[in-house]
């Protein structure tokens, strides 16, 4: 199975994907490892479709955030996996995932902006100067890319506001095991 987890910053994508990876025994690919800089959300989506989900030699160039350039090539295990990050779910990434012999599911997280901001700053206080710029890219991504996703693959939407991580994981796990496995 290939599970794509998307949502705005601070919505709980990394926590969810990490815990699902443990429960489902799947490798987790984090888009934070290959976004090409702070203006690279759309390019990150393209990297998933063109490189991470390739049927032969999948992988990506790890982004060197300190030097603002592409770094080493990171091979990705072919087959089942979880990919998480803002921009993970687009029509192109879903098409690329569907080429495989694996079932595909999408999980879209949302959350109240103040809660998400607080979570993101707690995780990485150096992110603060980039919050607005990244939020604009997310806004564009969700306006353009989130329409009709449920028509392409099973898609679960979860508003994480007021939920603890365990509740989010349980909903996602139940969805995956019902619709995908």
Where are these regions (language model features)?
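The Walker A (P-loop) glycine that initiates the GxxxxGKT/S ATP-binding motif of P-loop NTPases
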Residues: 7
């Amino acid at each position: 199975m290939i599970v794509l987890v998307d949502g705005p910053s601070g919505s709980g994508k990394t926590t969810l994907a990490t815990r699902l990876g443990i429960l489902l025994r799947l490798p987790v690919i984090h888009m934070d490892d290959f976004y090409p800089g702070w203006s690279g959300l759309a390019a990150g989506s393209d990297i998933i479709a063109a490189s991470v989900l390739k049927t032969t030699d999948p992988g990506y160039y790890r982004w060197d955030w300190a030097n603002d350039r592409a770094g080493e090539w990171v091979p990705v295990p072919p087959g089942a996996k979880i990919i998480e990050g803002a921009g993970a779910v687009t029509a192109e990434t879903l098409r690329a995932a569907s080429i495989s012999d694996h079932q595909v599911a999408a999980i879209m997280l949302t959350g109240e902006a103040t809660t998400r901001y607080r979570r993101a700053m707690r995780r990485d206080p150096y992110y603060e100067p980039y919050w607005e710029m990244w939020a604009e890219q997310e806004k564009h991504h969700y306006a353009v890319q989130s329409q009709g996703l449920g028509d392409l693959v099973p898609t679960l939407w979860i508003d994480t506001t007021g939920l603890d991580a365990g509740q989010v994981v349980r909903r996602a796990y139940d969805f995956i095991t019902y619709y995908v496995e």
